[in-house]
Amino acid sequence: MAGDVGGRSCTDAELLLHPELLSQEFLLLTLEQKNIAVENEVRVNKDNLTDLYVQHAIPLPQRDLPKNRWGKMMEKKREHHEVKNDTKRSSAVDGLRKRPLIVFDGSSTSTSIKVKRTENGADDRLKPLAQIGSTSDAFWKSPNSSSRISPLVLFSNLPVNHKMEHNNNDTQQNHDLMNRKSPSGPVKSPPLSPVGTTPVKLKRAAPKEEAEATNHLKPPEVKRKIQHVTWP
């Protein structure tokens, strides 16, 4: 059963919500199916049938409640139920929204951002490590530069060079002393030691003057200075 309401087609369910559009026979049939007693006076008048239908047969919550105690109690429950549904709907919408909406207004662009600068903060961090000292400057030179040699190589080579110079001086002095003390005649070689005997090595003690001279000739040992690298 379908009809037209306001120039548009309506389904049967929509017609049940508008009893004024229903026929008198349909209203009586609906009330009888609901087991609602209808008096003879009410059967004759369609307006009375419509009121009875709205009171007992129309789908909830469009149904009109009676003006008694039970009707007032049901009306309060209906209002409470509607308020609860509204709160549930609003909470569901808020739950779906991950974060609150940001409303942009032009006033936020007028704020200025201030950056606090320290006296030595960023400048010290941007300084290269080569400015720490001259030794570190030489150390951080690339290996391709042939003009300067890293101080580590110089420090490692110094003791070896001093030892070789000292040994050369000792051999030269020993040679001069032997020529001075040896006679003009031929030098006799010592007899060969027999087999099985171990040769005895004699050490000649150098005089005090020569020892002092060698000590003066020996350059002072250069101590390797430990450079502590401090990171900014």
Curated annotation (Swiss-Prot):
Residues 206-224 have a biased composition (Basic and acidic residues). Pfam families: Ashwin. Component of the tRNA-splicing ligase complex. It comes from the Eukaryota. Transmembrane segments: none annotated. The modification Phosphothreonine is found at residues 197-198. The lineage of its organism: Eukaryota, Metazoa, Chordata, Craniata, Vertebrata. The keyword Cell membrane does not apply. This is Ashwin. The keyword Repeat does not apply.
